[in-house]
């Protein structure tokens, strides 16, 4: 997998063709100035183009602890319940996590540090877990959040979102849509995403999407996907994107190809040297993606590291193809049940020896938070298995545990995104993508079972602090260095412009 270089696309400054309503011209410096606070670095003589969001992002001059965190290369998270999800390292009722130069250096009780060159964070009455990994998100749709509250995948989503609203996106709309989703993910505890934004209407749209991901600080796999309109240069533009942004492996952003199960697309992904990410399901007789995967397998085109989304209603033979090829699976149970995709393939995956990852899919109908995802997954699997028992069936599969579902949301997500060498567990040597979750709130306390508290009791409000690659992105409940009021303003302006261009009628009062 190729990863991002330090090249930086230009982020559009406005969603309208006339930029006169903006306070500055559409340069990377000005767009980032609109969205991310870099005032301290600018005052020191730097330019915003030279400053990533992590620089000088204190919530206020009085937050001494945060300022110290931003300045130190070593951070000690002290005295929390630590769920490493690494079976060799183990979990701890009380332990410390030492971060050094963006990586996890040590995990154990009573880590001793000396001197002033370390920032200490009190994690008592907190649960420390790896960050959530969302393996399938149409992230550009942030400005369309919940616009399809009662929608189905067909005809509503395909007609209204893909067919009507997506063609009306400018590069600036793609930027703010992606940025708002990425920042929202960080706020909710998602530290990595496989983005499948199908709004690559022009190369400038693709540049804007990448710019937004870079500006957000979120870890991401950019699965370059299709778009709408005469300016689409998909899929051939993937070569330009790879040359421009993905010639280094030591970055937060990696490249993949989002595509249908088509032999030419699989061949292109192999030629470029990136994984392919495909939506697949059987809706017989009109759609048989399982048969397409069989043909791809016979042509030798299924490879380790490729990702298969939904995988609904597949027979055992298709599951065997995916498993034997080294492929990974992403399931979106809440969306699949709500929008009519079909019965989530949770048990099908498990019965065929595949450990699935979880994904939000999109936010135009439901929340993208992982607490909703984990609970929905656990409830669905347990309901179907228990119902089989009530119907008299014997030799039932085991019920999912909270720890297993938490693994789906973290390490299995990292495996699916081909990031498990970097993140997914709190293991020494991995990059520090870490969540600090409040366990002392009255809706969680007293803490009787840590995995159960995370999966069954918590919601995004319990995500207190978020680290990505050792950098603090959320602190004590607030995003770090983000002008949220300005972001909200630009989201609404962009939403209004897209809806107006598309001639789409919203229904605020439902």
Locate the predicted segments by residue.
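Alpha-helical scaffold segments that flank or form the walls of functional sites
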Residues: 145-218, 239-248, 492-497, 503
């Amino acid at each position: 997998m190729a990863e991002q270089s330090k090249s930086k696309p230009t982020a559009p400054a406005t969603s309208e063709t006339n930029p006169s309503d903006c306070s500055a011209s559409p340069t990377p410096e000005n767009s980032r100035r609109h969205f991310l606070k870099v005032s301290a670095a600018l005052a020191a003589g730097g330019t915003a183009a030279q400053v990533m969001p992590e620089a000088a992002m204190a919530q206020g001059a009085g937050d001494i602890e945060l300022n110290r965190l931003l300045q130190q290369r070593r951070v000690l998270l002290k005295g929390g319940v630590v769920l490493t999800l690494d079976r060799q390292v183990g979990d701890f009722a009380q332990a410390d996590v030492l971060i050094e130069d963006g990586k996890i250096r040590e995990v154990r009780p009573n880590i001793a540090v000396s001197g002033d060159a370390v920032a200490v964070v009190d994690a008592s009455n907190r649960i420390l877990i790896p960050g959530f990994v969302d393996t399938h998100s149409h992230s550009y749709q942030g400005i369309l959040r919940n616009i399809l509250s009662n929608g189905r995948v067909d005809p509503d989503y395909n007609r209204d979102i893909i067919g009507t609203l997506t063609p009306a996106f400018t590069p600036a709309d793609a930027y703010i849509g992606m940025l708002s989703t990425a920042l929202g993910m960080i706020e909710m505890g998602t530290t990595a995403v496989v983005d499948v934004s199908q709004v690559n209407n022009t190369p400038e749209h693709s540049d804007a999407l990448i710019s937004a991901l870079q500006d957000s600080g979120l870890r991401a796999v950019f699965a370059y996907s299709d778009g709408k309109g005469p300016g689409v240069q998909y899929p051939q533009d993937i070569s330009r994107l790879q040359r421009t942004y993905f010639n280094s492996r030591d970055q937060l952003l990696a490249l993949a190809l989002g595509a249908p199960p088509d032999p030419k697309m699989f061949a292109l992904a192999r030629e470029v040297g990136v994984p392919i990410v495909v939506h697949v399901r059987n809706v017989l007789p009109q759609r048989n993606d399982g048969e397409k995967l069989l043909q791809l397998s016979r042509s030798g085109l299924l490879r380790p590291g490729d990702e298969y989304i939904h995988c609904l209603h597949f027979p055992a033979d298709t599951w065997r193809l995916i498993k034997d090829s080294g492929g990974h699976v992403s399931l979106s149970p809440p969306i699949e049940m709500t929008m009519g995709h079909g019965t989530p393939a949770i048990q099908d995956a498990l019965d065929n020896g595949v450990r699935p990852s979880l994904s939000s899919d999109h936010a135009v109908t439901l929340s993208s938070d992982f607490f909703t995802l984990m609970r929905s997954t656990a409830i669905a699997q347990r309901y179907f298995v228990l119902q089989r028992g009530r119907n008299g069936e014997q030799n039932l599969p085991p019920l999912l545990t909270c720890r297993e579902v938490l693994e789906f949301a973290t390490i299995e997500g990292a495996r699916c995104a081909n990031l498990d060498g970097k993140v997914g567990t709190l293991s020494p040597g991995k990059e520090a993508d870490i969540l600090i979750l409040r366990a002392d709130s009255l809706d969680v306390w007293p803490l009787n079972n840590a995995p159960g508290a995370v999966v069954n009791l918590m919601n995004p409000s319990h995500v207190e602090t978020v680290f990505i690659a050792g950098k603090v992105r959320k602190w004590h409940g607030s995003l770090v260095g983000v002008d949220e009021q300005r972001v909200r303003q630009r989201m609404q302006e962009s939403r209004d412009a897209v809806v107006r261009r598309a001639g789409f009628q919203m229904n605020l009062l439902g």
